[in-house]
């Protein structure tokens, strides 16, 4: 395979690095320092390339080729999946900042949730670490040259400078905007160092900062999802995981709209307070609306200036209309310090209105509120359609085989009814279809293997059949090359209980190797009366060896040999079949093994040779018994004759003479019958397999 050395790039496997990250089953989640340390360690490992790359000087080639990652390798594919899930989690963490502003119900002012500030900032920083690692990988990931995609997988570009230029001109700006720690800066750095009311700055800045990064993060997910599905074909391994993945995206949108609904509810109450404060400027200051200000009169007018009235119940146009945010204010969810209570209530509101496409939303005349309701309606329509379509696709993939089985059974029933088959044949057909479904689950193994490369198909067949073939003594003494040739030609077959694999007198078209089940091989020696021989075949046994003798004979005719035995399945049987044409192709290789050992092995384990040998021994034993009986009868006859002669000389009584005559006649008749009876016919001697080196 020397041609593979000049036109391929060879990368070292990154599986060991994957295990170092600790994503194994029994390992705890690694810390950020551990992840970064393992990433640096993995990037320092050398990777070997083929000789087709551009020539560089000795110093540059040793430094630049060490840190390049194969874009089609298993390490990067696994990392892209991890980063995809991390990106989705990041989209779920950013809306948590919207829950930081709260309304102090006792003092009627805006305040901040300090514990939530810290928790959201820590979670956001942890997720940003994945973005940092991803950016580092992007600067060290080779790419396929677009001009080389005419044929095959294309040529990998491993030049670090070219890789950096390509990444800087594509997604680097989006990744940079996504990784900027703007929410953390606003919460932990900007707010403590300003003179304006803290809650006012937080409320105004959070929406701007979050959406500045939220849009780039959403834009980055789609090409990442496309890359994962393009390289590995799927995101999740099972259909249920795929359905859960699509459902999680729908729930993520519900979480985002619920958090926005909460923040805008706080903003609308703040707007109502501002309008009420503008009406009495002599006693009210905007700083009174925030809990870091000082005033003793704010509770007097804020309690009655902004009543929470449903939009349908408003009769006075001067009353502030909270629209779709009335529920959040009346329920007191904006005044609660319990984060989980707020989170689940707002999440339920978002999920309910997304599912209802916003049909129950009664908005006010506020333009921002109307736009928010329209976005809920459109997003719900799009997401619900995608959710139903994708979940239907994933869930149908789990039942597609069952549906195909039902259709096949229905077609079979209609066909059997149309052809008016008898009940026994119908039962056999149903039993075979049921057994085939239980064994294969509707997977067409032959079609699946046929579409695989030859070497991979050979290895799979070796995995299936090699151990079984080695249990057959005939194949145990063969070399690996011959076993590979036999394995490649084997095809799986199924037999139901009481079905016939081979019938006596029919042409033998295949040789069977039993993998599971029990069969009976019987012969009547061509239907001769009184002859019956049966043996039982168990796993690792074989039958149809007439075909092997026929295939090994260079002078054999084109007609298949006639079977001398009937093979019937006593239980459900799984076996591998070697067809006559395939066996003929392999037979030329068998003739190289012209050893006596192979010939004796074939004779010893062949059912036909065993039957013939047993019959031959029985016939020899019968001949021995007949000869022994003939000798004894001859001796008895001679003894009787001597007795007759002796009695005649002694003039014995007539009665004794008559008895002696009768005994003599009986011995003579028995001997005559013994000589006239023929031995039972022997089964025909099986043909000798030709293991010579003659060419056919």
Swiss-Prot record:
Amino acids binding a nucleoside 3',5'-cyclic phosphate: 474-598
Coiled coil region boundaries: none
GO CC annotations on file: plasma membrane
Extracellular topological intervals: 103-116, 192-204, 265-367
Gene Ontology MF terms in the entry: calmodulin binding; cAMP binding; cGMP binding; monoatomic ion channel activity
Subcellular localization: Cell membrane
UniProt domain IQ: residue ranges: 610-639
Main localization, broad class: membrane
UniProtKB keywords: Calmodulin-binding, cAMP, cAMP-binding, Cell membrane, cGMP, cGMP-binding, Ion channel, Ion transport, Ligand-gated ion channel, Membrane, Nucleotide-binding, Transmembrane, Transmembrane helix, Transport
SUPFAM superfamilies tied to this protein: cAMP-binding domain-like, Voltage-gated potassium channels
Pfam families: Ion_trans (PF00520)
Membrane side Cytoplasmic: residue ranges: 1-81, 138-170, 226-243, 389-696
Membrane topology (UniProt): Multi-pass membrane protein
Keyword GTP-binding attached: no
UniProt key word rRNA processing: no
Region (Disordered): 45-65, 677-696
InterPro entries linked to this entry: cNMP-bd_dom, cNMP-bd_dom_sf, Ion_trans_dom, RmlC-like_jellyroll
TM spans (from-to): 82-102, 117-137, 171-191, 205-225, 244-264, 368-388
Span list, region Calmodulin-binding: 590-605
SMART domains according to UniProt: cNMP (SM00100)
Free-text comment about domains: The binding of calmodulin to the C-terminus might interfere with cyclic nucleotide binding and thus channel activation.
Oligomer and partners: Homotetramer or heterotetramer.
Family: Belongs to the cyclic nucleotide-gated cation channel (TC 1.A.1.5) family.
Function: Putative cyclic nucleotide-gated ion channel.
Official protein name in the record: Putative cyclic nucleotide-gated ion channel 13
The organism of origin for this protein: Arabidopsis thaliana (Mouse-ear cress)
Primary gene name: CNGC13
């Amino acid at each position: 395979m020397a041609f593979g050395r000049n036109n391929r790039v060879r990368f070292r496997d990154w599986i060991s690095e994957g295990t170092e990250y600790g994503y194994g089953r029994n390992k705890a989640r690694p810390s950020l320092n551990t992840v970064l340390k393992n990433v640096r360690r993995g990037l320092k490992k050398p990777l070997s390339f083929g000789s087709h790359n551009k020539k560089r000087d000795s110093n540059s080639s040793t430094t630049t080729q060490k840190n390049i990652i194969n874009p089609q390798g298993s390490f990067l594919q696994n990392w892209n999946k991890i980063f995809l899930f991390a990106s989705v989690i990041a989209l779920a963490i950013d809306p948590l900042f919207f829950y930081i502003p709260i309304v102090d119900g006792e003092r009627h002012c805006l305040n901040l949730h300090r514990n939530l500030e810290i928790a959201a900032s820590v979670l956001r920083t942890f997720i940003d670490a994945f973005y940092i690692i991803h950016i580092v990988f992007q600067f060290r990931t080779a790419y396929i040259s677009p001009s080389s995609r005419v044929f095959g997988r294309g040529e990998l570009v491993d030049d670090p400078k070219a890789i950096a230029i390509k990444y800087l001109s594509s997604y680097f700006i989006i990744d940079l905007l996504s990784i900027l720690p703007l929410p953390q800066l606003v919460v932990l750095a900007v707010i403590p160092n300003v003179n304006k009311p803290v809650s006012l700055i937080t409320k105004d800045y959070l929406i701007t900062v979050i959406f500045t990064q939220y849009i780039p993060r959403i834009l980055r997910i789609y090409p990442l999802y496309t890359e994962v599905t393009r390289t590995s074909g799927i995101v999740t391994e099972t259909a249920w995981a795929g359905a859960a993945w699509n459902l999680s995206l729908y729930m993520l949108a519900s979480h985002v709209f619920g958090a926005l609904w909460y923040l805008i509810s706080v903003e609308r109450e703040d707007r109502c307070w501002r309008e009420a404060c503008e009406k009495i400027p002599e006693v009210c200051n905007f700083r009174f609306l925030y809990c870091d200000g000082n005033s003793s009169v704010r509770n007097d007018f804020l309690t009655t200036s902004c009543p929470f009235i449903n939009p349908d119940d408003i009769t006075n146009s001067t009353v502030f209309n909270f629209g779709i945010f009335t529920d959040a204010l009346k329920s007191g969810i904006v005044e609660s310090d319990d984060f989980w209570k707020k989170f689940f209530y707002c999440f339920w509101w978002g999920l309910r209105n997304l599912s209802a496409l916003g049909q129950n939303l009664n908005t006010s005349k506020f333009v921002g509120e109307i736009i928010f309701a329209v976005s809920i309606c459109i997003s719900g329509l799009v997401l619900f359609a995608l959710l139903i379509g994708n979940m239907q696709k994933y869930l149908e993939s789990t039942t597609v085989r069952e549906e195909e089985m039902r259709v096949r059974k229905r077609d079979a029933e209609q066909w059997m009814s149309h052809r008016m088959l008898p009940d026994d044949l119908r039962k056999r057909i149903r039993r075979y279809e049921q057994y085939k479904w239980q064994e294969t689950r509707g997977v067409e193994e032959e079609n699946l293997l046929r579409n695989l490369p030859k070497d991979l198909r050979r290895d799979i067949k070796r995995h299936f059949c090699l151990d079984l073939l080695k249990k057959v003594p005939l194949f145990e003494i063969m070399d690996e090359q011959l076993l590979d040739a036999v394995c490649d030609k084997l095809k799986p077959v199924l037999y139901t209980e009481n079905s016939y694999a081979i019938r006596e007198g029919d042409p033998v078209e295949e040789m069977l190797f039993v993998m599971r089940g029990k069969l009976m091989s019987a012969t009547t020696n061509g239907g001769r009366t009184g002859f019956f021989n049966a043996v039982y075949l168990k796993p690792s046994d074989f039958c149809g060896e007439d075909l092997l003798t026929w295939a090994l004979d260079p002078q054999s005719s084109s007609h298949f040999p006639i079977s001398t035995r009937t093979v019937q399945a006593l239980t459900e049987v799984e076996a591998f079949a070697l067809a006559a044409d395939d066996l003929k192709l392999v037979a030329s290789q068998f003739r190289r093994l012209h050893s006596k050992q192979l010939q004796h092995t074939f004779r010893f384990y062949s059912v036909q040779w065993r039957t013939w040998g047993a019959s031959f021994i029985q016939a020899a034993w019968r001949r021995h018994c007949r000869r022994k009986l003939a000798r004894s009868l001859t001796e008895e006859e001679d003894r009787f004759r001597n007795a007759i002669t002796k009695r005649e000389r002694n003039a014995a009584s007539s009665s004794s003479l008559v008895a002696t005559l009768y005994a003599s006649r009986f011995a003579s008749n028995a001997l005559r019958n013994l000589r006239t009876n023929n031995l039972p016919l022997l089964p025909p001697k099986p043909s000798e397999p030709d293991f010579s080196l003659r060419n056919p």
